[in-house]
Amino acid sequence: MNVTLLIPARYGSSRFPGKPLAPINGKPMIQHVYERASLAKGLTNIYVATDDDRIKAAVEGFGGKVVMTSPEAASGTDRINDAINQLGLKDDDLVINLQGDQPLIDPTSIEQVISLFERHPGEFEMATLGFEIVNKTELDDPMHVKMVFDNNNYALYFSRSRIPFGRDTQDYPVYKHLGVYAYTRKFVQAFAALPLGRLEDLEKLEQLRALEYGHKIKIAISAFDSIEVDTPEDIRKCEQRLAVD
């Protein structure tokens, strides 16, 4: 199975401009993401998908591969779709979408979503990762997306709010979403062509579009947490984690 991992990266960010190039222990964040991904088994190719020449130069500077996408891409999925069209992938090729703000992603987490497609061919169109929240401050933080899933590990909903809500107890597991997706090229093209979903627009979560239009998302539960970098403070958290790893 051909497996291409794409890391969408854009320079402009309202909360943290230039985030992909923010230094973490002397290396740009995008390099940490790329190097972590390259340790995962089963990948055919890795590319950074960007529309910014500064990011392109940084990636090529450490020996990485880049595909330049349109600056008109309205979303991360549109950027991924643009990239796979340029790369000429086949309909059944597997695409891994690793968010560019995951500098501490564990390579085995990437292998987990690949394994789902290998073990359950044709049973679902999309797969992603979850992790049981340990840090209680994340429970009500809208930057940490929560998720619920059924007994067969198919996603029921994703939300920036705490889900599920325990009416009579607070002693229950809550899972957060980790920014890794897997899907076939054919599904990415179909997904990108769908109109914006109502719930997607409310929560600002693209994966809800898949659920709103009846597509199944398989969930793997990771044993490893990851830090999503949204602010400069998150950079310091990454450096602290790396210091003890």
UniProtKB/Swiss-Prot annotation:
EC number, as in UniProt: 2.7.7.90
Gene Ontology biological process terms in this record: lipopolysaccharide biosynthetic process
Database matches in Pfam families: CTP_transf_3 (PF02348)
Compartment list: Cytoplasm
Name the record gives this protein: 8-amino-3,8-dideoxy-manno-octulosonate cytidylyltransferase
Class in the EC hierarchy, top level: transferase
Gene (name only): kdsB
Gene3D superfamilies the UniProt entry points to: Spore Coat Polysaccharide Biosynthesis Protein SpsA, Chain A
Key words, A-Z: Cytoplasm, Lipopolysaccharide biosynthesis, Nucleotidyltransferase, Transferase
InterPro entries registered for this protein in UniProt: Cytidylyl_trans (IPR003329), KdsB (IPR004528), Nucleotide-diphossugar_trans (IPR029044)
GO CC annotations on file: cytosol
Pathway: Bacterial outer membrane biogenesis; lipopolysaccharide biosynthesis
Protein family: Belongs to the KdsB family.
Functional note: Activates KDO8N (a required 8-carbon sugar) for incorporation into bacterial lipopolysaccharide in the Shewanella genus.
HAMAP family cross-referenced by the UniProt entry: KdsB
Source species: Shewanella baltica (strain OS185)
Domain of life: Bacteria
GO molecular function: 3-deoxy-manno-octulosonate cytidylyltransferase activity
Catalytic activity: 8-amino-3,8-dideoxy-alpha-D-manno-octulosonate + CTP = CMP-8-amino-3,8-dideoxy-alpha-D-manno-oct-2-ulosonate + diphosphate
Main subcellular location: cytoplasm
